[in-house]
Amino acid sequence: MPKLKEKKLTIKDYEKLPEGSPYQLIKGALIMSPAPSYYHQEVEKKVFLILYENIEKRKNGKVFIAPFDVYLDDENVYQPDIVVILKNSKVKIIEKGIEGAPDIIIEIISPSTAYYDLIEKKEVYEKYGVKEYWIIDPKSKTFEIYLNSENGFEIISKAKIKGLVKSQILNLELNVEEIFE
């Protein structure tokens, strides 16, 4: 994803963009997010529906799907693919998104977002206390779950093509084969 401006931007600059603009503010840089592929959307839909059934329907929290702004600090406003906020979370839901670190963030990577999802955003999610970070790669059919511990993000569950991954926060297993079919 090409950077549009070199000058460090802030939330004030970001909020001047028209609603629905396909950008994220990553470490003070305005980054364009191209529309995801059909398969990306299929994977996202399947994960969202599993989470919706297990969280929202049971009144254990909220699940949001992109585009949805997550305000972490003055230079970082992200639009993760899926955001989970559990019932007792300390994040603040506001009209334009949320302020603070959600309990779980899920990124479904694509060639244009991989660098940001795997490095830049991952570092910021870790710093601000996202409890679990799920990285799903539809191309390689891998699904990784990281838990934020005193040592930072540590991989706690991983599967490729087949198998189960388990969220410790949700005590939920997901069948990877069903997600990628």
Where are these regions (language model features)?
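Gly/Pro/Ser/Thr-rich low-complexity, intrinsically disordered segments predominantly at protein N-termini
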Residues: 1-181
